[in-house]
UniProtKB/Swiss-Prot annotation:
Induction: By feeding. Interacts with host CD4. Interacts with host DC-SIGN (CD209). It comes from Ixodes persulcatus (Taiga tick). Salivary tick protein that downregulates host immune system by binding to both dendritic cells, and CD4(+) T cells. Specifically binds to the CD4 coreceptor on T cells. This interaction prevents the activation of the Src kinase, Lck, and its downstream substrate Zap-70, and results in deficient activation of PLCgamma1, the repression of calcium fluxes triggered by T-cell antigen receptor (TCR) ligation, and a subsequent reduction in interleukin-2 production. This is Salivary protein 15 Iper-2.
Amino acid sequence: MKVVCIIVLFVIVAVNESATSEANTSNAAKDTKKKNVTLQFPSYIQNPKQLALELLKICKNNKSSHNSLTSRSSYNYYAINDKYVDFKNCTFLCKHDKDINVTLNMPPNTPCGPNGQTCADKSQCVGHIPGC
């Protein structure tokens, strides 16, 4: 149920973002603050909502470039799921349409460990241990 709620929230944010030509990440973050959403990111991620919105933006941009190459989809659907964010490998799953999943890289400045590690040096990253 949580997964469905999170995906619905990201789709709502995505629709709000695409509905206004001047929408940006800070406006989407304001919309997200109105909802009670708990993201399952490690404790070393200081602002989980900001990271989720950044990953969603990367997913959207990848969807746009994917559509320009294939022009397969005519509607604007993209989503991420916090359960499929891999901090050890600095990747996340981006869902395009109902049946297209793409694994994308997280930005190099993304924290990937409790001691200040970032995705700029993936060899130093640690995996997320549930419950810790």
